[in-house]
Each structure stands twice: as C-alpha cells, then as structure tokens.
Swiss-Prot record:
GO terms for biological process: DNA recombination; DNA repair. Keywords: ATP-binding, Cytoplasm, DNA damage, DNA recombination, DNA repair, DNA-binding, Hydrolase, Nucleotide-binding. The keyword Hydrolase applies. Belongs to the RuvB family. ATP binds at residues 20-21, 62, 65-67, 171, 181, 218. SMART domains: AAA. Residues 1-181 are annotated as: Large ATPase domain (RuvB-L). It comes from Anaplasma phagocytophilum (strain HZ). The RuvA-RuvB-RuvC complex processes Holliday junction (HJ) DNA during genetic recombination and DNA repair, while the RuvA-RuvB complex plays an important role in the rescue of blocked DNA replication forks via replication fork reversal (RFR). RuvA specifically binds to HJ cruciform DNA, conferring on it an open structure. The RuvB hexamer acts as an ATP-dependent pump, pulling dsDNA into and through the RuvAB complex. RuvB forms 2 homohexamers on either side of HJ DNA bound by 1 or 2 RuvA tetramers; 4 subunits per hexamer contact DNA at a time. This is Holliday junction branch migration complex subunit RuvB. InterPro entries: AAA+_ATPase (IPR003593), AAA_lid_4 (IPR041445), DNA_helicase_Holl-junc_RuvB (IPR004605), P-loop_NTPase (IPR027417), RuvB-like_N (IPR008824), RuvB_C (IPR008823), WH-like_DNA-bd_sf (IPR036388), WH_DNA-bd_sf (IPR036390). Mg(2+) binds at residue 66. Its main location: cytoplasm.
Length: 329
C-alpha cells in the first residue's frame, strides 16, 4: 500500500531544494489565467464546505502540474494522497486507496493517461457517485458489491492529453492546460529560488539562465542549481550574465537552450536529407518514442525548428541555420 500511496511530506535529505517549490497559490509564478480561475474555484469550494470539482492538469513536463496538486490540497486545508497511473495495475490497488481516503481529501494521480481501462471504469462511479462497484466471484456466482466512499477531489496530471479516454476526460469538471513560460516569468522563478537558498544573482544572470530554460520552470531550477555549483567552486560572489554563460557552456546548453540530445536529434534528421519517422529517430538515438515526443519535440516545435508531416519529421530553415551557426554540422 505504501508503494502505491503516500502523503505529501518534505524530503528530509534536501529540504532546501524542496522549498524551491511554492506551497501557496500566491507564490506560484506564471500560468496567470489558470491561477486566477483556480483561486475562484478553491475559494468557492472552501466557503461552501464542499469538495472541489475534479481537476485535470495537462501540458508538457516540468510546468508545475505536481506543484499545483500540492497547492490545491494545502489551500483547501485537506490531506493530499498521491500515486501514479502505472502503479495502479489491479482493481484492488485503486480500491485500497479510495477506501482509505478521508472526507474532502485530494487524491493526485500522476500520469493518469497510463491507467488501465479496467481501473478507469472503477473510477467512473467513484468520481461521479462517490461509490465503488466491485465484482465479487466469477461466472454464475458473480455479484456486484457497492461500497460508499467519502467525498473527495481527484486531481489528474498528464503530458499526453490525447491518450485519455473521452469518458474519463469528461468527468473532470476543471480541465486546465499549462503552457510554456515566458523568459520574464522564468526570471521570477529563478530569483525566488536564489532568495530561498541565499544566492546572489543579478537580472542579467537570471535572464541568461531563463532564456536557455526551454520555457520550463523545472529546467530553469535545474540549470540554476548547476550554475550555483560552479559559483561555489570558483568562489564567485554573484551570478551575472558572463558567469552564467560560461557555466552553461560547460553544461553543454547553447543560447537557444538546446542540449546534446537535441543536437543529436536535429543532426540525425539533417543528415537523412528527407523526412524521418519517429520510430527511426528513436532507434538511432537509443531513446524511447514517448520520451522524444514528450521532452524533446515540444520545445523544438515551439521555437520552430521542426515540422511534423505525414511522412515524418523535417527541419525548418531556422533549425538548419542554427546548426550551421554553431558549427554542429
């Protein structure tokens, strides 16, 4: 049971890194339209002493879906229980979690698009009627046992919205699409992190890191921590644009935020001279197709470096110019 479900606790071995994650909705940077609406929904539910409608958070990885799930529970002043789609392989797994929820609790299911269909069907009645229908026995002796559940809020998170079945998708009253961050928003994320861990950084340094963070807070914080490591070792008093540029160069991150895997991806397509299928690319890079579609391609599409066609992936002129300017090809 503990492997399937855990209550949210700070990570004891690195509480400072955990503190980089905002815990209140007022501390959350970016996604302004979503946040303003979410404030209304949460306040309404809290004042009515009712459960918040089920929430579906979807968008590219690293934009704050898990953070928002924690914030929702904290703002509602209830407990958060979390698990993930791949862990729920049997009906009994989900039943054990649901029957252990307290009234008004928030259940967070990450990677909800990876739920088995039989698990989804159990969720339907739980989400709509707060009850659990379980088939007991087999064949002619089979019967349905109904178990009442406490009212709860399900928060689902996914990077693959299209893989969620329509019946499950329609049961979420609050679907929220998270989008890539602007450089200015990422600068605020980095400055907040610098303040939390007592690191001096000026606007130029924050901009240098933010502009290479692929529009993603998780990447911005990771790059900031690595630049901070160089700062500590090299006895630098402050992170400015020159120091950040040097550290990021050592990390293999170029001015557009591309890393070595991105360059391998783009170079392979360039050398093919024609459109290339995703399976061929995955085999050449020894990467999983899902990982390429979820972590590499969204940003390259956003900055206009690749196009998806019926025949496969092709590079844009902008991408080819970038590869040539940096002498990658």
């Amino acid at each position: 049971m503990n492997e399937l479900l855990h209550q949210h606790k700070a990570i004891p071995e690195d509480e400072r890194n955990f503190a980089l994650r905002p815990s209140l909705i007022e501390e959350f940077v970016g996604q302004s339209e979503i946040i303003e609406n979410l404030k209304v929904f949460i306040k309404s539910a809290y004042e009515r002493r009712a459960t918040l409608d089920h929430v579906l958070l979807y968008g590219p990885p690293g934009l704050g879906k898990t953070t928002l799930a924690h914030i929702i529970a904290k703002e509602l002043k209830v407990s958060l229980r979390s698990t993930s789609g791949p862990l729920l392989s049997k009906a009994g797994d989900l039943a054990a979690i649901l029957t252990n929820l307290q009234p008004m609790d928030v259940l967070f299911i990450d990677e909800i698009h990876r739920l088995h269909r039989n698990i989804e069907e159990i969720l339907y009645s739980a989400m709509e009627d707060c009850c659990l229908d379980i088939v007991v026995g087999e064949g002619c002796g089979a019967r349905t046992l109904r178990i009442d559940l406490p009212a709860f809020t399900l928060v689902g998170a996914t990077t693959r919205f299209g893989l969620i079945s329509n019946p499950l998708r329609d049961r979420f009253g609050i679907p929220l699409h998270l989008e890539f961050y602007s450089v200015e928003e990422l600068m605020l994320v980095i400055k907040r992190a610098a303040h939390v861990i007592c690191t001096d950084i000026d606007d130029s340094g924050a901009y240098e890191i933010a502009s290479r963070s692929r529009g993603t807070p998780r990447i911005a914080l990771r790059l900031f921590r690595r630049v901070r490591d160089f700062m500590v070792v090299e006895r630098q008093s402050i992170i400015d644009n020159h120091f950040a540029d040097s550290a990021l160069f050592n990390l293999g991150v170029d001015k557009s935020g591309l890393d070595k895997m991105d360059i391998k991806y783009l170079s392979f397509i360039y050398e093919a001279k024609n459109a290339v299928g995703i399976e061929t690319i995955a085999a050449a890079l020894s990467e999983d197709v899902g990982n390429i579609e979820e972590t590499i391609e969204p940003y390259l599409l956003k900055i206009g470096f690749i196009q998806r066609t019926p025949r496969g992936r092709i590079l844009t002129t902008k991408a080819i110019e970038h590869l040539m300017n940096y002498k990658y090809i």
